[in-house]
Structure formats: C-alpha cells, structure tokens
Amino acid sequence: MKVSALAENLRGSEIIKIAGEINELKRQGQNIANLTIGDYDSNIYPIPDELKQGIVDAYKDNQTNYPPADGVLLLRESVSAFLKNRLGLGYKPNQILISGGSRPLIYSTYLAVVDEGDKVVFPAPSWNNNHYCDLLKAKGIMVQTRAENNFMPTADELRPHIKGAALLALCSPLNPTGTMFHKKDLEEICDMVIAENKTRSANEKPLYFLYDQIYSQLTFGDNQHFDPVTLRPELKDYVIFIDGASKCFAATGVRVGWGFGPEGVINNMKAIVGHMGAWAPKAEQVAMAKYIVEEVKVNAYLDKLKSRIQVSLNSLHNGFQQLKADGFSVDSIAPMGAIYLTLKIDYTGKTTPGGTVLNNSADINFYLIKEAKIAFVPFSAFGTDDDVNWFRASVGACTFEDIELAIPRIKEALAKLK
C-alpha cells in the first residue's frame, strides 16, 4: 500500500530490531540480560513514593482536563525553582515549556529553528538527531568522535562544520555513552558558538544551541555537570535546554519533560507542541509540581537511585576491565553519568563455532545475545561507522545480580571465537 515518501524512507530503529530478537528468544523460554533499552524496570527502580501518591491524589481530585498549552503554571514555577536551586540557572515560568516527556521538546526545537535544507551539526554517537533531520529534510552533519575523548565532541572537531549551520545539538551526560563534557571542552565549544554568531547579520538566523541535559542529576563521583549558559551567560539568547523528570526520577512512563530557553523560541515551540497535542497529562503535572520542590525528599531519592545505578555500572565496568586483563579484546570507559556504560568488544572478523564470520558490530551483538544471553546496542545505531566496535550498555532494566552473572557468560562466549 502506498504511503508518503517521508514514511517510506524513514529509517527504522536498530534498537527495535534487537528487541525483536530478544523477545523471540524470551518467547522460547530463554532468560536474556537486556541492556539495550534506555529505560528503567519499574519493579527494580520505582518512581518516588511521594510522586506516585501525588499522581493518584491528582486523579482523585479530577485533574483530568486539558492542561494549559505551555504547562500548568504551578509546575513551571516549580521547575523554575528547581533549576535555580539545583543548577543555578535563572529562568522565569514564561521561559519554560512543559511537554509529554522530553522527546516532543527536542522535535519542537528542530521545528522552531530549522528549515528544510538547513545544516544541523551533532556528534556521532548521539541519540535520534539523524531521524529528526530526516523528518525535517534538514542536512544532518554527523561529526564522528573518538574514544580518547570519551566520545564527547570537541570544538576542533565541530568547527569545520559550524559555518552557516542552523542548529548545534549536544547532550551531556551523553546518551549513549554515559560520558560528560569537561569544563574546558564545553567552554571552547561555547566560545566557538559565540564567535560564529558574531559573524552573522541581523537578517540571518543565529546558530542555535540545543543542549540536552536530561541526565544532569545522574552524575557519579567527582564528575560535575556543566552547561553553556552558566559558563557563558551571553549564550542565553541562543541555548534551548532539554530536561525533565524521566531519567532522574525513573519516571519514563510518567511523561513530564521541560524545556527552557529564549522566550521567543519557547513561544514558537509552545504553538508546535500544542498542534501536536504533545502535552504532559495534567494530573502528572500537578503531582510533579508539588514533588520537585520537596528538596529533602528529592535528595534522598536521588542519592539512593544514583548509588544503585553506580553499583551496576561499576560492576559491568570492572567485569570488562578484568576480561581485558585476561587478554580479551574488550574495554570500557569508567562511568561518569546517566545509566549507560560504553563498552568495546573488538571481535570483527572472528568466526563463531558454527562457522559464521562476524562482519560488524551488529553481528557481534547478535552473537552475544545467542551465546552469552546478554544484549547491548552497537554504536552504529547512534550514527557511528559500522566498523566501530563500541556498544552502549544500559543498566536501568537489569538487577546488579543479572549483570554479575552475565560476565562469566560473556567470557565463555568470547573464548569460543576463532
């Protein structure tokens, strides 16, 4: 049946393909440690009790009609206070937009500042920027990053592509790597954006800067989150922040995200979100507004969540470092933030016991699913070249025990390759 050219040519998700393989094996009765999806198992990581009860209370209070187009005022006021208290960012409620999770905010940012044919610059690996470019018929410029920089882009890597671009889209802590910008590196990128905008006339669109910090509350050890506006306040007119409750409160299904930035851009995004009907449910907004200003309760929840996530990430990292020490061609980058660990499994060209040659990272992944009963996501799903044998491991849907038990299976599976 004939459909639109856009729908016909839109690329599917490699993660969904992997999920299909896992589901088929589960249907056959196999137990797979699924480290693919960037989500939480809510039986392992439930949302805060106070937030859950607040949602129930809001429904009992009949908070079930349409919310305001830009979000419930009480929530925008609470977000404003949350940003000031936790990140030192000063944004008024009229500079804040609420939506059903952060995804509509990213898409509406693209729609608000990018025209067909415009250049959008983003790093590889990164999450979904290539698909948003496809939807808008924008010219996506994927800048390949390097392991020695923790797969975070540098100003020197971005600079050759910035001239004339409409949008620079960055994320820290980064999905899929779980790594973060160091202060100096982000400062250099900020200075590059400032310099580029000084070359543009009043009749030209500036270079806008989308900064996704949905994982900003999930950092580990001495790793500190930095943002462009704190480092360079003169960027405030150009930076659109993406943030929300999904990751820091294990509330991916609650669907409350917030974006903030220049009032004019936010107003345009509000109209776009309204036409899409991508609002967050009103009851959830009311409950979130009350919860996020409870600083003691928020701190207690975050401390516990971060501690448990870090234990799982460290377990996987330490397991891979031991495999590396044992002579296996693997590596990992120490966890810095988010719920992800970056893994290297460099077995391209090896042959399985069944005689199949592993030609790329996808082949390696599907081999491990079948032989080691564990699933990752190759960086090729996030825009890197197929021959880059690095992977994302997401620990939010597995227990610490699942991860501990998986390491010996990985070792056994890799030892079988010739």
Question: Over which residues does each language-model region extend?
Answer:
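N-terminal small-domain helix-loop-helix segment of the aminotransferase-like
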Residues: S4, E8-G101, S108, I292-E294, ...
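Short, surface-exposed loop/helix-turn segments at secondary-structure junctions
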Residues: V273, K350-A362
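Generic structural signal for small/hydrophobic residues in well-ordered secondary structure
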Residues: I18, L35, I55, V79, ...
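Conserved glycine-rich beta-strand-loop-beta hairpin in the small C-terminal domain of fold type I
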Residues: D303-H317, S329-T351
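Short beta-strand
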Residues: I32-N34, I242, V330-M336
